[in-house]
Regions:
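Glycine-rich flexible loops
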Residues: 1-404
Length: 404
């Protein structure tokens, strides 16, 4: 049964906060909707952070043509939600997420068949994957609708290179679908590693070791150089390395209140090359593992192409020759928001704390995708033309909108 409009709006706001708490979405990614009649639903607005949403900002949309009421623009994926309501009359709550494990499995393009018994009661027998099309586009809506029509019993579907769509009878059912889908896909990833490696038990460390050995990239480093984090203000930046913090001039690299460490050259070079105001060293295990390969990254996920760049270079850490190292890293940073440092993780850079948080999440998810899809032997990449379009649109519009 459809919700009353005010209850629907309040539940959509509540869902956004709960999805963040459960780690199924972040920042403004994904979207949530609730049916209010046979002809209308309410949905989250475009480009607004879930933490600050109010019921007054939730938009009423017509199922038939996706026209909407008011001055607030609805989510650009409203057509995907409309398709779910159109083809499933009993569905009253829809969530589109960019959840990690489901997104990684979506990259393979394969349907999850014979869903594990422990998840089958919620997910059904299969979880199909909609064919790829660029996010927010009419081709994506058509591909998702085609997948829904061809799999009428599926209430959870994956969107290739993108994320997942769950279609619940109500709020609780939608969340059960999203959580069971993530747990199911996580198990698919782990079981795939066990099949390929012939190991009897799973561990994250063993999986990364298998990935590195498979790619002739040695072993995970026993220690990682602290490349520091910093925040720029005008012609100086505050650099933190370990437990030490000092101010450094962006023009001359001179420490204002102490002797600047060698890594200041790298930070200064990135600031001068990109114009960013924040830099952070990311050393999550999957990011370190991918940095050990010495190979650049290409986008496997739409979010990565939009927010990080068309690729991410992997530059060697030349200990003791930091002028050359800083120059190479600065060159690799241009036009991007991250650079891998061989054997030492990555540096991400942006203009707000929100940018840095998003970049950390996406680099970690993107590197996990590199590891897992390599083991699947299905490293499918987002087409270059779509990467270019998404990156251009994001830089021009979306990144400005979320900071307003």
């Amino acid at each position: 049964m459809a919700y009353e409009i005010q209850e629907a709006k309040e539940l959509v706001v509540k869902a956004g906060k709960e999805l963040i708490e459960k780690g199924l979405i972040a920042r403004t990614w994904g979207n949530v909707s609730a049916r209010i009649s046979d002809t209308q639903f309410v949905i989250t607005p475009s480009g607004r952070a879930y933490e600050d949403l109010t019921p007054d900002e939730i938009v009423v949309v017509n199922i038939d043509d996706c026209s909407y009421e008011g001055d607030i623009k609805p989510s650009s994926e409203k057509g995907v939600h409309a398709a779910a309501y159109r083809h499933h009359p009993t569905v009253d709550f829809v969530i589109h997420t960019h959840q990690k494990a489901a997104t990684i499995v979506s990259i393979t393009g394969m349907t999850v068949t014979n869903v594990y018994d422990e998840f089958r009661g919620v997910l059904g027998d299969t979880v199909p994957c909609a064919k790829y099309a660029m996010s927010t586009t009419e081709p994506l809506r058509k591909n998702v609708e085609e997948c829904i029509i061809e799999n009428p019993s599926a209430r959870a579907i994956m969107l290739m290179h993108h994320g997942a769509l769950v279609m619940g009878d109500d709020y609780d059912h939608a969340f059960a679908l999203a959580e069971n889908l993530e747990a199911c896909c996580d198990k698919v990833i782990k079981d795939n590693y066990l099949r390929h490696s012939w190991e009897k038990t799973y561990s994250d460390d063993a999986k990364r070791a298998y990935f590195l050995d498979k790619n002739g990239a040695g072993k995970m480093p026993e220690s990682i150089c602290d490349l520091g984090s910093s925040v720029r203000c005008s012609n100086t930046f505050t650099l933190t390395v370990g437990d030490k913090t000092l101010d450094v001039g962006t023009d001359n690299g001179v420490g204002v209140n102490g002797i600047a460490p060698k890594v200041e050259k790298i930070h200064r070079a990135i600031y001068n090359a990109t114009g960013c105001t924040m830099i952070k060293h990311v050393t999550t295990p999957d990011v370190v593992a991918v940095s050990c390969t010495g190979e650049k990254m290409r986008p496997m996920i739409d979010d990565f192409a939009q927010i990080v760049g068309l690729d991410v270079k992997n530059e060697p850490w030349i200990n003791g020759d930091t002028d050359e190292c800083a120059k190479a890293i600065a060159k690799a940073a241009k036009g991007r928001n991250a650079v891998l440092i061989e054997g030492n993780g990555a540096l991400v850079f942006g203009n707000t704390e929100g940018d840095i948080q998003a970049l950390e999440i996406i680099m970690d998810k993107g590197c996990a995708a590199v590891v897992d899809c390599d083991i699947f032997n299905r490293p499918h990449y987002v087409p270059k033309a779509e990467c270019f379009l998404m990156r251009t649109v994001y830089l021009a519009k979306y990144s400005k909108q979320i900071d307003e």
